[in-house]
UniProtKB/Swiss-Prot annotation:
PANTHER family: NUCLEOID-ASSOCIATED PROTEIN YBAB (PTHR33449:SF1). It comes from Cupriavidus taiwanensis (strain DSM 17343 / BCRC 17206 / CCUG 44338 / CIP 107171 / LMG 19424 / R1). Keywords: Cytoplasm, DNA-binding. Belongs to the YbaB/EbfC family. Homodimer. Residues 88-110 are annotated as: Disordered. The keyword Metal-binding does not apply. This is Nucleoid-associated protein RALTA_A1934. Binds to DNA and alters its conformation. May be involved in regulation of gene expression, nucleoid organization and DNA protection. Its main location: cytoplasm. It is found in: Cytoplasm, Nucleoid. GO terms for molecular function: DNA binding.
């Protein structure tokens, strides 16, 4: 009986590992957009944190514009994109891990 339970558990773990790999491949394809300055700066990245593009409104590049402000807006847009990617990842992975007895707030390493 114990041997059968262990074999079942191993099979379940292997299936979950395969599902995790598929989910990570899917997350690499999902893009999120972070914004700052009411959309003047946009960062598009995947849920695997690969930045695809950065868009800066031309008005921010005009002569006399504040370089520090532009740098802050880029950082804020990037951080917004990272938060959205994390939220999307948690949402997608949540359905996969819903049957696991994990403590509340436990973060998996993906």
């Amino acid at each position: 009986m114990m041997k059968g339970q262990l074999a079942g558990l191993m099979k379940q773990a292997q299936q979950m590992q395969e599902n995790m790999k598929k989910m990570q491949e899917q997350l690499a394809q999902i893009e999120v957009e972070g914004q700052s300055g009411a959309g003047l700066v946009k960062v598009v990245m995947t849920c695997k944190n690969d930045v695809k593009r950065v868009t800066i409104d031309p008005s921010l590049l005009a002569e006399g514009e504040d370089k520090d402000l532009l740098e802050d807006l880029v950082a804020a847009a990037f951080n917004d994109a990272v938060r959205k990617a994390e939220a999307t990842t948690q949402e997608k992975m949540g359905s996969m891990t819903s049957g696991l007895p994990l403590p509340p707030g436990f973060k998996l390493p993906f």
